[in-house]
């Protein structure tokens, strides 16, 4: 094929010129920095799922399934703040919620709402994963690690968790810890989110 011949016959200097051409005046003009993202496998290796947390996720997913199928008379109640922005406050809330969840367990399956991402129709803080320090630094690797650690800590006290999957990358880092994954109102018409569901 002529086009593959042309590609294969490019000289080293031509290829070097292609890869070093400065397009910063026209490409990604609103991007301040590009940083590598940790892989899900590395984060899971750093913060693995303990057996007790895995068992809780599995049993609470099964319980929700039974409730939705009418095989369990309890109600599923997802309760929690609009979004997470502080680990210690989230854990204080989780401890208080755990006491209520235990007291009401005959009638309710309580799942803590732990939403890390904020859907935005305008500019604004995008959430704990995207900007964990609330300072515009967009330290996403830290945000992903902090989010995963928080989920592990909530599971450790015995509460299942729910979150909204807004960014399609986030589930790869935290879905193994989530009992209930939600697709929000702003993304229900998104084909990629429907495929995720």
Predicted regions and their residues:
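Glycine-rich anion/phosphate-binding loops
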Residues: 84-104, 137-149
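Conserved, mostly hydrophobic/aromatic
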Residues: 80
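Structured alpha-helical segments in the cores of large, soluble enzyme domains
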Residues: 55-70, 97, 146-156, 189-193
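Short, Lys/Arg-enriched N-terminal segments with co-localized hydrophobic residues
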Residues: 1-9
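N- or domain-start disorder-to-order transition segments that initiate the globular core
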Residues: 28-71
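Active-site-facing alpha/beta catalytic cores
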Residues: 11-27, 107-197
């Amino acid at each position: 094929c002529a086009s593959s011949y042309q590609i294969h016959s490019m000289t080293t200097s031509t290829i070097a010129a292609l890869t070093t051409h400065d397009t910063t005046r026209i490409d990604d003009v609103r991007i301040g920095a590009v940083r590598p993202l940790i892989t899900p496998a590395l984060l899971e290796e750093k913060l693995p799922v303990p057996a007790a947390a895995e068992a809780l996720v599995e049993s609470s997913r099964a319980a929700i399934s039974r409730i939705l199928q009418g095989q369990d008379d309890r109600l599923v109640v997802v309760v929690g703040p609009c979004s997470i922005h502080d680990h210690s406050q989230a854990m204080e809330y989780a401890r208080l919620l755990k006491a209520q969840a235990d007291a009401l367990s005959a009638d309710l399956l309580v799942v803590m709402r732990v939403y890390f991402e904020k859907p935005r129709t305008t500019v604004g803080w995008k959430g704990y994963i995207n900007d964990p320090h609330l300072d515009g630094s967009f330290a996403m690797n830290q945000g992903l690690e902090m989010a995963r650690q928080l989920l592990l800590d909530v599971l450790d006290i015995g509460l299942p968790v729910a979150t909204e999957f807004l960014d399609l990358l986030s589930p790869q880092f935290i879905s193994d810890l989530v009992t209930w994954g939600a697709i929000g109102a702003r993304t229900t018409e998104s084909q990629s989110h429907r495929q995720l569901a």
